[in-house]
Regions:
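Bacterial N-terminal signal peptides that target proteins for export
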Residues: 2-27
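Residue-level signal for mature regions of secreted extracellular proteins and peptides
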Residues: 33, 136, 162-165
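C-terminal motif of bacterial Sec signal peptides marking the signal peptidase cleavage site
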Residues: 35-39
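Conserved binding-pocket/active-site segment within a compact domain
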Residues: 146-179
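Short Fe-S-cluster ligation motifs
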Residues: 170-214
Length: 214
């Protein structure tokens, strides 16, 4: 290559390198920012609008539908609690299409200490289960958008008969997907109020414990 063409080649090479650097360099902090926002978003997905505290010892209730929901895929159940005739009751209504509610009595002494401080979100109702991607999920059973629009906390979600891995609000007709808690049909708005859920062996090594909290 003669001197003239060598000069032109090096000049073009230098210009291309500068162009690539000027294009890519501004994207570096942007990509770092996106990564940071993503990790922060995961932490911020837990709702603290209403207090949630629920603990359930599965070993005292073999075959219970709460545990069945956590051991499946795309399986969920509505959970609520009440205190009647000096006994705590846990009610569980799975999305299995049978429309049956299990009544679980809490009578064991170790469980009663937890029952006294049950607080199941906005209006005594949560949804727990396991997603199709093996991710435990827990949501408030109230429609967050109707709470925002109308006030109060009496907007319970029910299973969508067309797809029981979804819930629907009778008031606003929004449909929420339980995989991620997002609105998949209806007006724009907030996703479901999500809570943390842990499911593991009890500290004393006897059986497993389900805990939902924020």
């Amino acid at each position: 290559m003669n001197q003239k063409y060598s000069y032109i080649y090096n000049k073009v090479k230098s210009m291309v390198a500068k162009a690539m650097f000027s294009t890519l360099f501004p994207l570096l902090p942007l990509s770092m920012g996106i990564s940071t926002l993503t990790s922060c978003g995961a932490e911020d997905s837990i709702s603290r609008r209403f207090h949630c505290r629920f603990t359930f010892h599965t070993q005292n209730h073999p075959g219970n539908t709460l545990e069945i929901a956590l051991n499946g895929f795309g399986t969920y159940t509505f959970v609520s609690a009440s205190y009647k005739n000096n006994i705590w009751h846990i009610y569980s209504t799975p999305n299995d299409g049978r429309n049956k509610t299990e009544d679980i009595r809490i009578t064991a002494a170790p469980e009663l200490q937890y029952a006294k401080v049950y607080n199941l979100g906005a209006n005594n109702g949560i949804i727990i289960g396991n997603s199709n991607f093996n991710k435990y999920r827990a949501y408030d059973r109230q429609c967050p958008n109707c709470i925002d629009q109308y006030g109060g906390t009496n907007f319970p979600l029910n299973w969508n008969s067309a797809n029981r891995q979804q819930v629907i609000c009778a008031k606003c007709h929004r449909i929420y997907d339980l995989e991620y808690g997002n609105i998949i049909d209806g007006a724009d708005g907030s996703r479901l109020m999500e809570y943390s859920l842990s499911y593991g062996t009890a500290t004393n090594g006897t059986g497993k414990v389900i805990s939902v909290y924020n």
